Amino acid sequence: MYSKPFVNNVHSGLAFKQVLLIGGTIMRTQTEMYKLILDIANNDDRIRAVYMNGSRTNPNAPKDIFQDYDIVYVVTDTKAFYEENGWINKFGEPLYMQKPEMMDNLLGEECHLEDTYGWLVIFKDGNRIDLHVNSIPYAKKDILNDKLCQILLDKDHILPHMPESTDIDYHVKRPNENDFLCESNDFWWCLNNVAKGLWREEVPYVMDMLNSVIRPHLVTLLSWKIGIETDFSCSIGKSGKYMNRYLSQGLYNRYLETYSDYKIENLWDSVFTMCDLFNEVANEVATSLGFTYNQIEADAGMKFLQVVHNLSKDALEIPSFI
């Protein structure tokens, strides 16, 4: 039986204290949780191996009390686990949970429960486990798809050797010129939808366009700036949550100013801030990577926004742009 030491390189260096959470229950420590996870695996012959991924195996992720335990049990039969009512209670008393594969199955979406099944659980002591049971054949392939995977237990040496966990798969990727041009074009083009939405005072539509369609282009552009400055050796995290590590405080504050409340004029302010920021950084990225930025397109997009911003509510036509 193989059990890889994981204390030193998975969760060392944590200085925070455990806290009292829901219902006054004391939050179990990392040591207690890891022991529980491995004890359950060692005492169940159906579980042949355990591996972990996510923030706890990422050396660059911040360490705090909200980190999930992203655990995979490699099992002889997944069905035996998801048909056993209350099995998940071995890990503690759940506050509430989600079962992604069960939900997909209920909604008629294609899923293969014989390969993988999961429970995402927040327990009453505040700990969260994202646990999946994977079949042996599925696990052998799955573990190779994420360089953050780290083997905690392998009773039969069935899993492939995994090097030291790294977040390299999530590093900012160097763009080519087509990536850059398409990202820029979609940013400026989709802003015309925001302009007419603001003129019509369709706030839900505007918010959706800004945050679901346009903002990702700005985040991508900022990630390229960060990539250039770090030789594309870092990750900015999901939704750019780690950008503040790499951007100057002034630039990061300007990015935060692109968020707005629901008031129309405040939304316009955030849009123009977003445009100025995108235009500035796009020119910088283009210069650094030897690309050509379509400034004519950007200027035209800005002109359209400014005209619509100044357009009266009773206007019967859009002024000529000639």
Per-region residue spans from a language model:
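Short hydrophobic alpha-helical segments enriched in small aliphatic residues
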Residues: 7-12
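Short, Lys/Arg-enriched N-terminal segments with co-localized hydrophobic residues
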Residues: 13-26
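Metal-dependent nucleotidyltransferase catalytic core
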Residues: 26-45, 53-64, 72-131
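Conserved NTP/Mg2+-binding pocket subregion across the NTase superfamily
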Residues: 91-211, 310-312, 316-322
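Conserved nucleotidyltransferase catalytic core and NTase-mimicking acidic/glycine-rich helix/loop elements
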Residues: 171-322
